Design a protein with these regions (language model features):
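Residue-level signal for inorganic ion chemistry
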Residues: 29-33, 57, 68, 103, ...
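N-terminal subdomain of lithium-sensitive/metallo-dependent phosphomonoesterases centered on the IMPase/IPPase/PAP
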Residues: 1-100
Length: 280
């Protein structure tokens, strides 16, 4: 008798298998990015000025999808470039993939970019997430209830977020490609920075969240993100013990989210003491 593809996974070994698959898939995407060469970028614009896509975005997403589909053919995959693909008999599990978070950085050879892969269970709860940053030589990962981890130069380190109350606290944020939205964000930056010593804008939401998890940033907050931008990084920050706010966006399975819904929603991560710094 064959296994029911819609049956829920067991919490223990099956969760470990999900994380391992996420790691393998993210590594496949990152391997594509590691082959970066200027001649092969093939850059085009997706609409908003500065919202770029390259041949590497597309190839990395294909690599990630191939790994996931080979192992779990009944899972749904939502990717930044390829949208949502439903299998004939969906298991209820859904993967969220950003093959190249930080495309502008990648084009300009700025090292803050990577492949982000996360998976949610049939209830929509994120279970495992990985951000693989090949130019940094870092892989951040987490599974629900098992902490957040960094692998770098063969060493594995558990992450516990930033130290509370330290001096010189740094806020990370980002800005929209849309000039009108960006002007609003810039106008509110002064009040958002109240109490922080400095601000950073790295250009990769996934890595900003991971840098809160590893204690580099004290806080990160940005509105207007897509699910694939925050899915893995938010889980990693959460499992590192950080306070995290994810947008409550309409699922891609229900045709969402709308631009208005997305642009009004904040994604945040910080120590609990800094949670009140961000708009509701």
């Amino acid at each position: 008798m064959s296994a029911d593809p819609t049956a829920p996974l067991d919490a223990g070994p099956e969760l470990a298998a999900l994380l391992e698959l996420a790691r393998t898939a993210a590594a496949a995407g990152a391997a594509v990015l590691a082959g970066r060469n200027t001649a092969g970028l093939d850059v085009s614009n997706k609409g908003d000025s500065g919202d770029w896509v390259t041949a590497f975005d597309l190839a990395a997403e294909t690599a990630v999808r191939n790994v996931i589909t080979a192992a779990r053919p009944f899972d749904t995959i939502t990717g930044e470039e390829g949208g949502t693909v439903l299998p004939a008999s969906p298991s209820g599990y859904r993967w969220s993939v950003d093959p190249l978070d930080g495309t502008t950085n990648f084009i300009r050879n700025i090292v803050y970019y990577g492949t982000s892969v996360a998976v949610a269970d049939p209830d929509g709860v994120w279970q495992a997430g990985v951000v693989n940053a090949p130019a940094l030589g870092r892989t951040y990962y987490a599974s629900r209830g098992n902490g957040a981890w960094l692998e770098e130069q063969g060493r594995r380190t558990q992450l516990f977020g930033p130290a509370a109350g330290r001096t010189g606290q740094i806020l990370a944020t980002g800005f929209s490609y849309d000039p009108a939205v960006r002007a609003e964000q810039a106008a509110g930056l002064g009040s958002l920075m109240d109490g922080f010593a400095d601000v950073r804008r790295l250009g990769s939401a996934a890595l900003d969240l991971c840098l809160v998890a590893d204690g580099t940033h004290d806080a990160y907050g940005e509105r207007g993100l897509n699910e694939h931008d925050f899915a893995a990084g938010a889980l990693i920050a959460e499992e590192a013990g950080c306070w995290v706010r994810r947008p409550r966006l309409t699922s891609p399975l229900a045709g969402g989210p709308s631009d208005d819904e997305r642009l009004s929603a904040w994604t945040c991560a910080a120590t609990l003491e800094l949670s009140g710094k961000f708009p509701l």
